C-alpha cells in the first residue's frame, strides 16, 4: 500500500530529447528556401557569364565618345513659390534652325566617320541667393506636335536637383543612333524634311519646368546647353607610320 510518502518509481520521471534529432520547423523551411534561391541565383549568374567580356558605363554621359557642348542660352528667371516655370520648349522651328546651324557650322567639322550616339539636354541652375532653397525640376519627352504647354504649372512630384545644380536629360531614342553622314546636304536641301526625318526620328522633344521649395520668390541663373555624345571611329590607316610602330 502506497502512501503519499512512499517511493513511486513513476513519479518525477522526465524524458530527455536529443536536440540533434529535432529541428525547428521554421528553420527547416527557411533553409530549404535559401538553398533553392542560391541554386537559382547561381544558374542566373551562369547564364550572364558571357556578358563579362563587355564593358558599359554606369552613367552614359561619362561613357566612351567625345562630348561636344553647345550652349543655348543663359538668363535669369524669377520663380514664384509652389509653381514651376517652363524654360525649354522645342516647338519653335526658328529655335531649332539656329541651334542646328551653330552645331554643324561652328562646333566642329562634320566628317563621314562620326556618329551622334546620344544628345543630352543639360540645365545648370544656380539660385542667386544660395543655401536658402533647393531647386526642383520636371520634364516631359513625348508630346504631340500641336500640344501647347502651359507657361506655369503647379508643383506635382518634382525631382530635386543635386548639389551640383545640374539637371541632365537624355534626348536620344533608345537603340537608334543618328549617323552624321551627309547631314549638311540634308539640312541644306530642305529644313522641314530635316526636322521631321532626321531630328524627330532620332530625338525626343523636351519640355522642362523648374521651381524651388522656397516660400518666397527666387531668382535662378539658368544655363541651358546641349551635349552631343559623338562616336569617333578609328581611321583606316594610322596617322603616323614609322619605326615607332
Swiss-Prot record:
GO terms for molecular function: structural molecule activity. It comes from the Viruses. Belongs to the polyhedrin family. Major component of the virus occlusion bodies, which are large proteinaceous structures (polyhedra), that protect the virus from the outside environment for extended periods until they are ingested by insect larvae. This is Polyhedrin. Keywords: Viral occlusion body. The keyword Coiled coil does not apply. One of its GO terms (cellular component) is viral occlusion body. InterPro entries: Polyhedrin.
Amino acid at each position: 500500500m502506497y502512501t503519499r510518502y512512499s517511493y513511486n518509481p513513476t513519479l518525477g520521471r522526465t524524458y530527455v530529447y536529443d536536440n540533434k534529432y529535432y529541428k525547428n520547423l521554421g528553420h527547416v523551411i527557411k533553409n530549404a528556401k535559401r538553398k533553392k534561391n542560391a541554386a537559382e541565383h547561381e544558374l542566373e549568374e551562369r547564364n550572364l557569364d558571357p556578358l563579362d567580356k563587355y564593358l558599359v558605363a554606369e552613367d552614359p554621359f561619362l561613357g566612351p565618345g567625345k562630348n561636344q557642348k553647345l550652349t543655348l542660352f543663359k538668363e535669369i528667371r524669377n520663380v514664384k513659390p509652389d509653381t514651376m516655370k517652363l524654360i525649354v520648349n522645342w516647338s519653335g522651328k526658328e529655335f531649332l534652325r539656329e541651334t542646328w546651324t551653330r552645331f554643324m557650322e561652328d562646333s566642329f567639322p562634320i566628317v563621314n566617320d562620326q556618329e551622334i550616339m546620344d544628345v543630352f539636354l543639360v540645365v545648370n541652375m544656380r539660385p542667386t541667393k544660395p543655401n536658402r532653397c533647393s531647386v526642383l525640376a520636371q520634364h516631359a519627352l513625348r508630346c504631340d506636335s500641336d500640344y501647347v504647354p502651359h507657361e506655369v504649372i503647379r508643383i506635382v512630384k518634382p525631382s530635386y536637383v543635386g548639389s551640383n545644380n545640374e539637371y541632365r536629360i537624355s534626348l536620344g531614342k533608345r537603340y537608334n543612333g543618328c549617323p552624321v553622314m551627309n547631314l549638311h546636304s540634308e539640312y541644306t536641301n530642305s529644313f522641314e524634311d530635316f526636322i521631321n526625318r532626321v531630328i524627330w526620328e532620332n530625338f525626343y522633344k523636351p519640355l522642362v519646368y523648374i521651381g524651388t521649395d522656397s516660400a518666397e520668390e527666387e531668382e535662378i541663373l539658368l544655363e541651358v546647353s546641349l551635349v552631343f555624345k559623338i562616336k569617333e571611329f578609328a581611321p583606316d590607316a594610322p596617322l603616323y607610320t614609322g619605326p615607332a610602330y
